[in-house]
């Protein structure tokens, strides 16, 4: 079954897609795997390249294999709100298809990213044949809804300090730390950090400086080192 180990040449390095998308590959039988292997495509996105726009009709399930993706919505006065950040290996772009609506958000590559795309029609074929696969997506949607609920509360009820502390912890959770064990593995502009925390850029800059003065973090350009995680958790908690 050579198709079971679909190897794809990307940038001269072999990428074992089935291994990366094990969550949806494992539940499938050989026939279903062959079907999926014949239907997925790989797409490279450059930094800041748009993957889908607000108002578009969803056609594909996206799976981020490498890189980082931001899901955002352009708000009032040209201010954009980052709804969530996608890390490998995570699935996105399929919720509106199930809801029979267009995209209410946009997605763009935060850095060079590799995305595996599966037509929703092909996914629907597999879902009707495979209960375990269907359960996986029910679970995914449930987890995402839980995270969204929590974020709604955080962004609406917490004060500025609490929101920014929350965002820094959220980025650590999502992307981890560099080898030094304290620098966030994602370098956000002040504007992106503000958009993630639902505040103005000037408030984000001011609050970051406060955190640095209080020795909770150190800042070097876009690099943020977390010095006192416990204190950040406390600030995030009391809001």
Report each predicted region and the residues it spans.
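Cyclic nucleotide-binding regulatory domains
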Residues: 24, 49-111
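Short aromatic/basic micro-patch
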Residues: 61, 85, 109, 117, ...
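Polybasic "coupling" helices that flank or enter modular domains
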Residues: 128-198
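Cyclic-nucleotide recognition modules
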Residues: 32, 84-146
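Phosphate-/nucleic-acid-contacting segments
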Residues: 173-239
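Cyclic nucleotide-binding regulatory module and flanking cytosolic helices
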Residues: 6-47, 91-92, 96-98
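Short loop/turn motifs at secondary-structure junctions and domain boundaries
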Residues: 34-35, 51-55, 178
